[in-house]
From Swiss-Prot:
Organism lineage: Eukaryota, Viridiplantae, Streptophyta, Embryophyta, Tracheophyta
EC number: 3.2.1.15
Alphabetized UniProt keyword annotations: Cell wall, Cell wall biogenesis/degradation, Glycoprotein, Glycosidase, Hydrolase, Repeat, Secreted, Signal
Keyword Amino-acid biosynthesis: no
GO MF assignments: polygalacturonase activity
Catalytic reaction annotation: (1,4-alpha-D-galacturonosyl)n+m + H2O = (1,4-alpha-D-galacturonosyl)n + (1,4-alpha-D-galacturonosyl)m
Protein name stated in the entry: Polygalacturonase
Tissue and organ expression note: Pollen specific.
SMART domains: PbH1 (SM00710)
Organism: Medicago sativa (Alfalfa)
Subcellular location: Secreted; Secreted, Cell wall
Keyword Glycoprotein attached: yes
One BP annotation, GO: carbohydrate metabolic process
Primary location group: secreted
Gene3D superfamilies the UniProt entry points to: Single-stranded right-handed beta-helix, Pectin lyase-like
Length: 421
């Protein structure tokens, strides 16, 4: 009797184990092998997972794989986790994937998890060499015409954690039309001289969180585009790169308002810019940008640490004949400390057509060669409190000052000069 009971218990354990594993789909079971293209195997595994009425996990084991591009599309019947523990390589030849497509694209998903220790290698070195120098990239050789590493399009209630995006030929990650998507413990890496390799760019998305993430690129570590609302960037290490940016904005008539942005507890090291808002002059966009907060930011040798630039025109792509029409309001820079690579630690260049309202500098304590940095301001009178450089701008909305000034300087920016892209 005891023997029979033991057999039954063992059988039930095995049955339960098998049932628990039934939702795990290893691509090797679908023909996916290291050192070969896994497009078909991954597509087959995805189709099976997407049709499942219970949660499923797709696993790409350790090893090096090739992939010429894939679109993983929903809606699916239940949550899906894609666990990547290997290295997946994009085509080195940018012409394999046409236009501005995304190499690894997710569409119309709810409850997606992308996890693992894996690396998505965009193999961008050939593009970087072809397009140098960066200042020439606005023409036909621009890498804006080649593919990005990732696209998350209309992906909701989802998380990306643990994986690495390496050497994308264009932006690393595009987030578009998403709601409640989180990047946590994500790594993005590309050479500091790799143009247009923004880390995470988002647009027309709500409740996006970028947490505890390391980003080093040749462009903005994070760029927040139009239609972005309730965005949190927290615990991000940025460098090399062009900093943490809202914008650029105003270039197109179809743009939507930006509001509710919080950038907090971030560290920037040797970046070309720090925390920044940028809008185009002489452009048709008329949106509003409000409730933007940068707080508890640490900088080490950062050029242009604090910037509002409403005369943003990289590589002279436009004119400053007419001012920006983008209205900026309720913007704060609080507890920003560290060292600057430029004497001017704060540059606030607002629009003469719609001057900035409600800008606050609170404990902005930056040093250049051991001395406090200065401030340059146009069309804005910020409220300055604590230790911070004080600036004034005649004709702008009134603001009070209760600061312990680190320095004070009022100036008009030199013609034709704009902070680095």
């Amino acid at each position: 009797m005891k023997f029979s009971t033991a057999i039954i218990v063992s059988f039930l354990f095995i049955a339960d184990f098998c049932a628990a594993q039934s939702g795990v789909l290893d691509i090797s079971k679908f023909g996916g092998k290291p050192n070969s293209d896994i497009g078909q195997a991954l597509t087959s595994a995805w189709n099976e997972a997407c049709a499942s009425t219970t949660a499923a996990k797709i696993v790409i084991p350790a090893g090096t794989y090739q992939l010429n591009g894939i679109e993983l599309k929903g809606p699916c019947k239940a949550p899906i986790e894609l666990q990547v523990d290997g290295t997946i390589q994009a085509p080195a030849d940018p012409s394999v994937i046409k236009g501005t497509e995304q190499w690894f694209k997710f569409l119309y998903m709810d409850h997606l998890t992308l996890s693992g220790k894996g690396v998505f290698d965009g193999q961008g070195a050939t593009v970087y060499k072809k397009a140098a120098p960066a200042s020439a990239w606005s023409g036909k050789n621009s890498n804006s015409k080649v593919f990005m590493n990732f696209g998350f399009n209309f992906v909701n209630n989802s998380i990306v954690r643990g994986v690495t995006s390496k050497d994308s030929k264009n932006f690393h990650v595009m987030v578009f039309g998403c709601k409640n998507i989180t990047f946590d413990g994500f790594t993005i890496t590309a050479p500091g001289d790799s143009p247009n390799t923004d880390g995470i760019h988002m647009g027309k998305s709500t409740d996006v969180k970028i947490l505890n993430t390391n980003i080093g690129t040749g462009d903005d570590c994070v760029s927040i585009g139009d239609g972005s609302k309730q965005i949190t960037v927290q615990g991000v290490n940025c460098g090399p790169g062009h900093g943490l940016s809202v914008g650029s904005l105003g270039k197109f008539t179809t743009e939507e308002n930006v509001e509710g942005i919080t950038v907090k507890n971030c560290t920037l090291t040797a970046t070309d810019n720090g925390v920044r808002i940028k809008t185009w002059p002489d452009a048709p966009g008329t949106i509003t940008v409000s409730d933007i907060h940068f707080e508890d930011i640490t900088m080490t040798n950062v050029k242009n640490p604090v910037i509002i630039d409403q005369e943003y025109y990289p590589w002279n792509q436009c004119s400053k004949k007419n001012p920006s029409k983008i209205k900026l309001s309720k913007i704060s820079f609080k507890n920003v400390k560290g060292t600057s690579g430029t004497a001017e630690g704060v540059v606030l260049i607002c629009s003469s057509a719609v001057p900035c309202d409600g800008v606050e500098l609170n404990n902005v304590d930056l040093k250049f060669n051991g001395a406090p940095t200065t401030a340059k301001c146009t069309n804005v009178k910020p409220l300055v409190t604590g230790t911070a450089p004080v600036c004034q701008a005649p004709g702008a909305p009134a603001a009070s000052t209760t600061a312990t000034p680190a320095a004070s300087k009022t100036a008009t920016p030199a013609a034709g000069k704009s902070p680095a892209k």
